[in-house]
């Protein structure tokens, strides 16, 4: 199966944060029947994603958990951060880290972001180059 990576480019007109877009994408992907790992740069970012998912309208509830949380049943969306990740199988990786996670090879689909900030944009370009060199099929989409 071909490995694909989709980069979402936040344009100057975009009013959403990367975290908001990641939550919306995770919800949509889960509704299509896939299990998602959102890999955050920090625990603080993971907690922000967790809170955003809990704040959604009750009719749009998205079952999720933070890595390491005890749950009776596995949830379809896991939120992890550097150094903290369960080993449960997931279909798609939403990468919010500054680098490509070392476990990315276990996925066939990655979603990543190109923020507006120049330093973060440079890091995103490096991730794009890395994935291209590893043979991933890459695509981009403007947001905003």
Swiss-Prot record:
Record-level Gene Ontology MF annotations = DNA binding; DNA-directed DNA polymerase activity
**EC number(s) given by UniProt:** 2.7.7.7
Record keywords: Transferase included?
yes
Homology family: Belongs to the DNA polymerase III chi/HolC chain family.
The identity of this protein, by name, is DNA polymerase III subunit chi
Give the record's subunit note. DNA polymerase III contains a core (composed of alpha, epsilon and theta chains) that associates with a tau subunit. This core dimerizes to form the POLIII' complex. PolIII' associates with the gamma complex (composed of gamma, delta, delta', psi and chi chains) and with the beta chain to form the complete DNA polymerase III complex. Interacts directly with the psi subunit (holD). The only subunit of the DNA polymerase III holoenzyme known to interact with single-stranded DNA binding protein (SSB), interacts directly with DNA helicase YoaA.
What this protein catalyses is: DNA(n) + a 2'-deoxyribonucleoside 5'-triphosphate = DNA(n+1) + diphosphate
Gene Ontology terms: biological process = DNA replication; positive regulation of DNA-templated DNA replication initiation
The answer to keyword Transferase applying to this record is yes
Source organism, top-level taxon: Bacteria
Annotated organism of origin: Haemophilus influenzae (strain ATCC 51907 / DSM 11121 / KW20 / Rd)
Q: Which UniProt keywords apply?
A: DNA replication, DNA-directed DNA polymerase, Nucleotidyltransferase, Transferase
> What is the recorded function of this protein according to its Swiss-Prot or TrEMBL entry?
Part of the beta sliding clamp loading complex, which hydrolyzes ATP to load the beta clamp onto primed DNA to form the DNA replication pre-initiation complex. DNA polymerase III is a complex, multichain enzyme responsible for most of the replicative synthesis in bacteria. This DNA polymerase also exhibits 3' to 5' exonuclease activity. This subunit may stabilize YoaA and/or stimulate the helicase activity of YoaA.
InterPro entries (UniProt xref)? DNA_pol3_chi (IPR007459), PolIII_chi_sf (IPR036768)
